[in-house]
């Protein structure tokens, strides 16, 4: 019987959204967005992350100013309980995504392991 892999993917999407980890992440994100100070700090943190990633991806050097700003913003974020909570929830969700990715990649790993035997 043929499986529509896209239907399976949509079921996985729905399942992820129903996990306690995702629901907790949504709640934590809502709490950050409802607090003006936390929201501003979190947005600044994300902007700095994107800037650093863009520089890394394009081979640009990360200058001292960017490093200093990143350190300052990271310190501010660590001092905000709402953002710390959000990051903890993100980490829990990341663990699930990594586990799912490992499961999804198993058929390819098995294929190449058999081919190499």
UniProtKB/Swiss-Prot annotation:
Disulfide bonds: none annotated. Gene3D superfamilies: YheA/YmcA-like. It comes from the Bacteria. It holds the Pfam family Com_YlbF. NCBIfam families: PRK13676.1-2. Belongs to the UPF0342 family. This is UPF0342 protein lin2326.
């Amino acid at each position: 019987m043929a499986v529509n892999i896209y239907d399976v993917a949509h079921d996985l999407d729905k399942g992820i959204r129903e996990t306690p980890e995702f629901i907790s992440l949504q709640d934590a994100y809502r709490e950050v967005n409802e607090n003006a100070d936390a929201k501003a700090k979190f947005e600044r943190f994300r902007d700095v992350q994107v800037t650093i990633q863009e520089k890394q991806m394009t081979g640009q050097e990360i200058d001292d100013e960017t490093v200093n700003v990143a350190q300052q913003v990271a310190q501010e974020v660590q001092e905000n309980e709402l953002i710390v909570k959000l990051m903890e929830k993100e980490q829990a969700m990341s663990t699930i995504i990594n586990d799912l990715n490992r499961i999804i990649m198993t058929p390819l790993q098995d294929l190449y392991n058999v081919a190499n035997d």
